[in-house]
């Protein structure tokens, strides 16, 4: 058998395998396979990246369900917020030992006080009128080298447990995406997916670790040159300087990060004021050296309160690693005085 014939058979086998995979993919993911997403098997996009996949406005004539409520978060009534809280409390977490226990303000505060309005979709049972599905989009700034974009971060995607398996989540996502595109002209949205990875090319992949805070012993400082400072409304200038520094470094290609996604300064200070997030600065000789970001996720595990560390950033790149770790332990000590947190959730992302 000559080499040309062998190559033809190899090409034929690869082609058949690829076609069969496409059929499997469309059957396995009937909703996602129709969405403008970068997939691993998108060979053309792998070789010649096109950037934004869908630049033109989507066709809304057949894909918009007007019975799905779509509005700005600031326009929600008190009853709508209460209904949303009830849905999330009963259905947001997947396991029985997990409980999501927010108040009305804990939910809405993450969606307001932003330059670009956050929007929300509500899916109601057509017979009973109960709220059985929801999703929100809130805008964050994505900064990469020579790229600065507003991206819609998708959150609170939740469907009542008794109504799952009916593609309600898919309908909410599609409706929300189309309406958002026509409202803001934004074409980039960010999803956070937990668990088994789907065949989409992710922006990043990271692990999340759980720790018992009782295992962290109290740190006793023996010198005064190094300490931890909680960011409040009186010293938010340090946070502003950090955001400015991060943006300048990545735009000048001198950053340790390839990509930064952050909330605008105005919204961060609002969350600090409402005590939804706690940001600590490691101070040495009156100068910031590192920052530690914690979020109250209003979630308990076996009735134990948890706190989430979602970012740890060096302000000075040459800071000693031992000092960076010491600052983290000092921040943990401070958090224990704020509330009775028992579990630390650490996102290994920065």
Predicted regions and their residues:
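Beta-propeller domains
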Residues: 274-281
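Short, flexible loop/turn motifs enriched in small residues
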Residues: 287
